[in-house]
Amino acid sequence: MKHTRQDLNIMQGWSLEKKIKVSQMKILEWYREYNGQVFTSFSGGKDSTVLLDLARQVCPDIPAVYVDTGLEYPELRDFVKTKDNVIWLRPRYPFTQILEKYGYPIISKEVSDVINGARKGQPYRLARLNGELLDKNGKKSIYNCENYKYLLDAPFKISARCCYHMKKAPLNKFERQSGRHPITGVLACESKLREQSWIKFGCNGFECQRPLSQPLAFWLEEDILRYLKMTGIPYAPISVSYTHLRAHE
């Protein structure tokens, strides 16, 4: 179901109580569509911790899947070990080998992808990097990222492929082998790409090439923090700054 940015703004303004109800409704809808053959993507971070708690309130048998890249903070790994029914995955290749072959992820996945494509002469990514991309109204696109043009001359390879091989590839393989469909804790407010994904597919992307549920997409970070404070559920302290939590007392 396609939405608008205005729809997202309205939903982001809902009360936390309403957001909880709608998110759990979306989780149940996803669970029933695939006869329970689903899983939550669990990193040990605050967003996926809230997602797992919401999901297991309505569907207690949902497994969580954690990709152990070897790069996480020990505190996060220790926290993941406290949860029941968690499936641990590992990437096929070590981090150093992936960096050597594909390059470093710089600033963000989105920026790394633009730099990599621009270096290959791809017109769309060059336009974004030069600040020349226009939207459908002929105005300067919000997807321009000319502030990072200097990275074109960086003396090392830059790529977003690192994230794919370290996290996405193990999850994709698990999906194919298990037949389960993912529920993720991403928030639309975290990036333009995630916002566009929600606008195009909504919370439950049944029609995606890779079906994906993102029932927290319309939440804000302050909602996540309020939920942790309100419920008192355990979380990894390293994933939440002391300043942020005090602000929501």
PLM region descriptions:
Residues T243-E249:
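Conserved small/polar residues in nucleotide/adenosyl-binding loops
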Residues K2-R226, M230:
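ATP-dependent adenylation/nucleotidyltransferase module used to activate substrates
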Residues P234-V240:
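Conserved S-adenosyl-L-methionine
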